[in-house]
């Protein structure tokens, strides 16, 4: 029983980090699973939307869809698609910031990429 729990724990990695972007404190929570990645981005503890993206052998652009939340807000799906392309994994993204300005979103994405370069084993 303990061996199977240890093996299961080795397949899951949790990583949390925060950044102050444009005077807003943004929190990032990453859960790396065996073949997938879950990323939550937000300032308050809410899960307002969820998107998923994954690579396909039929198209170089990863397929993506919104699982729940406001489908007119494509921030989560776009970020999931770009991260799926970068990691070659199935990526779930929940982007829960009210500021969806493209410049701010780019700052958020750059902070994620910076963290990926610093801690590749967490992604």
Swiss-Prot record:
One of its GO terms (cellular component) is cytosol. The keyword Mitochondrion does not apply. GO terms for molecular function: protein-containing complex binding. Keywords: Chaperone. Chaperone protein which promotes assembly of the 20S proteasome. Interacts with PSMG3. Associates with alpha subunits of the 20S proteasome. This is Proteasome assembly chaperone 4. It comes from Mus musculus.
């Amino acid at each position: 029983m303990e061996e199977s729990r240890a093996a299961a724990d080795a397949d899951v990695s949790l990583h949390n980090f925060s950044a102050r972007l444009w005077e807003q404190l943004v929190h990032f929570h990453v859960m790396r699973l065996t073949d997938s990645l879950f990323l939550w981005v937000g300032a308050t503890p809410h899960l307002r939307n969820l998107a998923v993206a994954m690579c396909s052998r039929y198209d170089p652009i990863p397929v993506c869809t919104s699982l729940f939340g406001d489908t007119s807000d494509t921030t989560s799906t776009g970020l999931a698609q770009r991260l799926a392309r970068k990691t070659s994994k199935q990526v779930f993204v929940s982007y829960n910031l009210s500021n969806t300005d493209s410049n701010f979103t780019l700052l958020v994405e750059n902070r994620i990429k910076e963290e990926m370069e610093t801690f590749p084993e967490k992604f």
